[in-house]
Structure formats: C-alpha cells, structure tokens
Amino acid sequence: MQVLPQTRVQGVPSGRNLSCSKAVGGTPLRALTRDVVRPARSVNVHVVADGESADDVLLRSSSVAVAEKPKVSGRAFRRSLKDTGRYVAKPINDKDSLDLMEEHGVGYSSVGLVAQMRANNNEWRFKDIRVKLASAYGYCWGVERAVQMAYEAKKKYPDRQIHLTNEIIHNPTVNERMTEMDINIIEQKENGSKDFSKVSRQDVVILPAFGASVQELSLLKDLEVQIVDTTCPWVSKVWTAVDNQARKAHTSVIHGKYSHEETIATASFAETYLIVRDIEEANYVCNYILNGGNKEEFLTKFKNAISKGFDPDRDLARVGLANQTTMLRDETMAIGKLLEKTMIQKHGPAAIKEHFMVMDTICDATQERQDAVYQLVGQQDNPAEKLDLILVVGGFNSSNTSHLQEIPELKNIPSFWVNEAACIDPVNKKITHRTAHGTMLDTQNWLPDGPVTIGVTSGASTPDRAVEEVLEAVFKTRDASFGGIAPNYDLGTAPVVRHEEH
C-alpha cells in the first residue's frame, strides 16, 4: 500500500510585490499552520485578503481634503492638464533609454533566448525538452510604453525627485528596477491613504500604466508637480466610454475587479457605477433589472463595487458597459450581450438606445495573448503537438496573467504560474506556483522524466528576461551542469520587431 506524504498548509497574507524570492526564500511570512494529509505533494497556501471597496479607495485617494472630484467631466479635466505645461503623456522614443531597458532586463530581448526562439519559429530544444512559445506573449505596447516613459523621465530629470503613484506595472522585476533608479512609490499612511506630504513642487510624479483616479490627478495638478502620465491608451479608451455614459446619465456597469487599480481609476470617471466580476454577478444584476428583488440584499452583495448612494431601483434603468482591459474578452462580450438582451426585454427594442450604451473597449493585446494560449492548448489531440505542461510567467498580482493561467486550468492541462526564476528550485526539483484563483502551491517533481513538451506564455507586464531566466531554471532542473544560453549577437544587428501598436 502506498503511504501518502504529509502536507503542510500555510495561510499567508499576500501583499504588493509578492514574489517567490520574498515569500519562499526571503524573510518568512507570519502564518498559522496546520498539518493535513493529502496525496502526492507539499502545498503552501497563501490566503489573499479581500480588498476594500472601490469607493472607499476613491474617498481616501489622497490625504488632502481638497482633492475632490472636479465638477467638469473627468475627460475634460484630463485634457486641461495639457494646458499646465507640466504634463507629459507620450514617449519620445529615446534610444539610450530603450538600450538601458534591455541592459536592465526590462525591455525586449534582441540577442537572448527569447529572441533566438522568435527566430526559430517560437521553439527551442534542450536535451529531451521541447519548448513552444506562444505566438503572442509578454510585453504589450502599452506596458513597454509606460516603462520607456519612466526611463525617459529619469534621463530628462536626473536631479529631481521622481515618485510613482503606484507600481508602474504588475511585475516584480520591473518595479525593483524602478526602486534601484530611485523612482519610488508614494508611501501610504496607516489608514491606507497615500502620503503626498513629501511631494514638492519641483518633483516629478509618474502615473502607472493602469492610470490614476480623477481625484489623484486633481491633487497633483494643485501641487504643481511635473506629471508623466504613462496610462495605457487602451485604458484611456475605457475612460472615454465611461465619461460618455456619465454625460448621458447612464450607470457604468464595469466588468472588472473592484480592488484593481485600473478599475478604481475607471470608476472615478463615472458618475454612477456598478462593478461586476463575472457573468454570474451580471446574471444576478440582470435578474434584478427584470424581476426586482431584495434591495438590501443587492446592496450588501455589491457593497464594495458600487458608487456612493447607489440605488438599484433607480440606477439600473439606463446602463452602459465598460471593462477592465485585462479581463477575459469572451466574458466581457457575454456580459454585454446579456445586458443588451435584458434591456430589450425590459424596455423594448425601440427604446434600447435610450437604455443601453456599449463601446468596444476590449484591449487587443490582452485578447491576442489569450488567443495564443488557446492555440497552444488546442492541439492536445495531436500527439506530435500535445503539451505535457504549460508555464505561465508573470507577476502574481497581474490580472491579465491570471486569465492566461485560467485557460490551461479549464482544459485540465498541468500548468504552473510563476513570477520569476526563483520560483523554480532545480536542486530539489520543486516549483512554487500560483493558481488562477490565488492559491500558492509547492509541487515536487513537477518536471516529468523523459521527453517533454512545454508550452510557455507570459503576461503583458512581463519582460523577456524573466521568461529567459525561468526557462534556464527549467533546463538546470533537467541538467545540473547547464551553464546558460549564449547570446546571439547576429540577431542584435537587426532591429527588434516589437509588438504591434493598436
């Protein structure tokens, strides 16, 4: 009879920039532990705490009482920043900054393993390991643009203090580089509000790729700082949709996660909003629209995801759809169709334009990466192309990466989401990884013996270097004498083909 090993389960609070090196190899995190018996592997569980409401975050978005939402529309207010002479919203494509990004491992690979895979039909072989890189992966244009603008700001303002209102993107390596360059995230006070007291008029403040709330923009304008706005244009497109909905007195139904920075910023551009996480919550809302229900139950269910004073009986008569750009495209589209169908049933086809607004705000880059993973997993019936497992590389707090991980999980393909090479322990044949829904696991002997085909993808905030280092850890797991992949400088003579701007 086989003896099942004991499994140690830990409940650990996760925080900003959680990484394998910090959660596993660094200072131990406080935890309550208990021993349970489970088959096959050692499991280390990190419990993710619930976030506070989007409205709470907006209410305490600064420590300055005057930072209230401007009376003009958010879109008009953002345009007004351009008239200050202290607002930059586009990169200048400085070559030195791009070169430094690659040197620091936060740009595109032009000579390393990923570049060599691109030149080899997105494949690589090491001994009996075959690696298949997704056709669309890693840095999207908006993320590269944000990091590039931060590097350009450091070059342009070398003697000025530079602040970030939040992580510039959801990747630990990139955020560590920001800190090394003395570009630091504005600290939070005990109550969670950002402490702008150390920001002075001569300073530079960088807004991250997922944007900032109207309240924060108003505060920064009043402080008369130099603003470098790296907000992804796709996120700005969502804000435009929400602003249009507000001007036409429609409630914005936002498909997203209420605690995500992008959704918090998007909500600040709305007059009235309701955030739904998935199709199940959207079905609940649509059932209420058609049949009514218990208002108190509704308000309790969505207490963290509604604007102040929200009344479902009043505010669901006219709605518009918006989305967090990193959500699953198919689910956003399904929610849109459900809302449209519901409003037609409620108000009739002739009145649909008065009661429902929709604008295509789905990010192409997010969809391309999801489609590429579907393509990877879509050949499991073909023995020559079947994947034995999938590696997903990206920050553990990255929403778009979680949805990439979700795809192989739904297909029952062994998949491991790691955020850096430190998650892989070649000596002990162990991998620390995360599930799409936030559980951290330690898996022993995760890499099968014999010939193995591995699919690889990475989140839109993940630089190529992170993928290269993860794959090198995989190869070292197979062969302890592995010494790395030599750069191919012949590839470096040609310009890097970057992901397309949409």
From Swiss-Prot:
Keywords: 4Fe-4S, Chloroplast, Iron, Iron-sulfur, Isoprene biosynthesis, Metal-binding, Oxidoreductase, Plastid, Transit peptide. Its cofactor is [4Fe-4S] cluster. It catalyses: dimethylallyl diphosphate + 2 oxidized [2Fe-2S]-[ferredoxin] + H2O = (2E)-4-hydroxy-3-methylbut-2-enyl diphosphate + 2 reduced [2Fe-2S]-[ferredoxin] + 2 H(+); isopentenyl diphosphate + 2 oxidized [2Fe-2S]-[ferredoxin] + H2O = (2E)-4-hydroxy-3-methylbut-2-enyl diphosphate + 2 reduced [2Fe-2S]-[ferredoxin] + 2 H(+). Binds 1 [4Fe-4S] cluster per subunit. Homodimer. It comes from Botryococcus braunii. It is an enzyme of class 1 (oxidoreductase). The keyword Acyltransferase does not apply. [4Fe-4S] cluster binds at residues 140, 232, 363. This is 4-hydroxy-3-methylbut-2-enyl diphosphate reductase, chloroplastic. It is found in: Plastid, Chloroplast stroma. Disulfide bonds: none annotated. It holds the Pfam family LYTB. InterPro entries: LytB/IspH (IPR003451). GO terms for cellular component: chloroplast stroma. It comes from the Eukaryota. Its EC number is 1.17.7.4.
